[in-house]
């Protein structure tokens, strides 16, 4: 019975990977080498004295999500098909969600530290590391964890840029890292206008292209709160005047 449950869970998680890869740029994706910063093409795939807030109860901030995946055709013969796929993607973004349950399979629950750590390792096995970030992929990940695991989608928020964006949910071990798209990719005529990799930097107020990076140290090092406590507002433990002044200085809106 345990083996059967494991196979079922694996099947659902594989569907997640497939949906993430299909989101604006399936087939092939360029992933950044963690050690040298190089790209390889693969088939898709201090706050002392302050009380650190958990990831529970944070508001879902649609519109904070930035940047998109990258893909280059493997061979010259694929370029026509690739260009057509880019056009098809414009009209078929909802197709990426086919197969997601309409209602959660389990009772809804808030994200907790332990759950965030467990889900982080689970998602890592599905190949999220090095995948380019996009609004669609953000939405797919939220929807998957809501429908399959019952996790209320109010937790996946990251600090503002520029630079590395750290998770505001303590226990979520994924950060968003800015990368430079290669000049060769820039010059590829199939990428002009239609592909999100060319337009993603215009979506980001800082003009950066981001990818997901797994960072196990985030399990005990609450970088978001340590580096940017002002982004937690009233939960930061800072005087209201101080955290508002810091947000204003960084050009971050607040209410």
From Swiss-Prot:
Region of interest (Disordered), residue spans: 1-70
Gene3D superfamilies reported for this sequence? Nef Regulatory Factor
Q: Which GO terms describe its molecular function?
A: GTP binding
Keywords on record = AIDS, Host cell membrane, Host membrane, Host-virus interaction, Lipoprotein, Membrane, Myristate, Viral immunoevasion, Virulence
- Compositionally biased spans, kind Basic residues: 1-14
Region Acidic, as annotated, extends over 88-96
Q: How does it sit in the membrane?
A: Lipid-anchor
- The answer on whether this UniProt entry bears the keyword DNA repair reads no
Instruction: Map out region (Mediates dimerization) in residue numbers.
Output: 139-155
Cellular compartment(s): Host cell membrane
Positions with an attached lipid (N-myristoyl glycine) read 2
The residues forming the signal peptide are none
Q: Where is the composition biased (Low complexity)?
A: 35-52
* One cellular component (GO) term of this entry: membrane
Please report, in chain numbering, the residue ranges of the motif PxxP.
104-107
Source superkingdom = Viruses
Family per similarity comment: Belongs to the lentivirus primate group Nef protein family.
Q: Any idea what job this protein has? A: Factor of infectivity and pathogenicity, required for optimal virus replication. Alters numerous pathways of T-lymphocyte function and down-regulates immunity surface molecules in order to evade host defense and increase viral infectivity. Alters the functionality of other immunity cells, like dendritic cells, monocytes/macrophages and NK cells. One of the earliest and most abundantly expressed viral proteins. In infected CD4(+) T-lymphocytes, down-regulates cell surface expression of CD4, CD28, CD3, and MHC-I or MHC-II molecules.
According to the record's subunit comment, the protein's assembly and interactions are: Homodimer. Interacts with host CD247/TCRZ; this interaction induces down-regulation of cell surface TCR/CD3 complexes.
Q: What is known of its domains?
A: The N-terminal domain is composed of the N-myristoyl glycine and of a cluster of positively charged amino acids. It is required for inner plasma membrane targeting of Nef and virion incorporation, and thereby for infectivity.
The molecule here is called Protein Nef
Please name the taxonomic classification of the source: Viruses, Riboviria, Pararnavirae, Artverviricota, Revtraviricetes
